[in-house]
Amino acid sequence: SRGLGDVYKRQAVNEEGERWSMMTLEDFKAARSVLAGVIADTHLVHSVAFSKATGNHVYIKPENMQVTGAYKIRGAYYKISTLSDEEKARGLVTASAGNHAQGVAYAAQAAGVKATVVMPTTTPLVKVNNTKDYGANVILHGAVFDDAAELASQLAEAEGYTYIHPFNDPILATGQ
């Protein structure tokens, strides 16, 4: 696991009794080194309109300038970079209504890994087509994200794919 550190070993328990991993500055530095040269360097931009509306100095970070149009490429790319050769060889599966789907598809293509993305049937066509253009096998299923996520989990179990959770993963979050 390249750049992984001990992120899965440092865990705490939240109010619901669920375990979650604490991320450290070293984890973020490891992710940054993997992502260097992959993602666009997006600088903060002062927003006059939002500053006026809130009475504060507001700055925005234009992550829409990333190759996939969203910050989700950061987490997906970093997560896939930490997978073992065996996990990559099994192929990937995820569920998403758009931005995570494109991030996984792009990162998988860059790593030479096959990816299947399950998307709700209500996903905007531009996101479906972009995900396909990045090389993923897209399956449209269900009207809402939960339907797509259920099928993706079933495919991971039945086909042995490595499941890339769209948000509940400390490695993915470290990259984002």
Regions found by a protein language model. Name each.
Residues 1-8:
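Short, small-residue-biased leader/transition segments that mark boundaries at the very start
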Residues 12-18:
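Acidic, Ala/Val/Gly-enriched low-complexity intrinsically disordered segments
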Residues 5, 13, 75-77:
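Sequence-pattern detector for short linear motifs
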Residues 8-9, 27:
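Generic signature of intrinsically disordered, low-complexity, basic-rich segments
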Residues 19-176:
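PLP-dependent amino-acid enzyme catalytic core
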Residues 9-10, 153:
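Alpha-helical interaction segments
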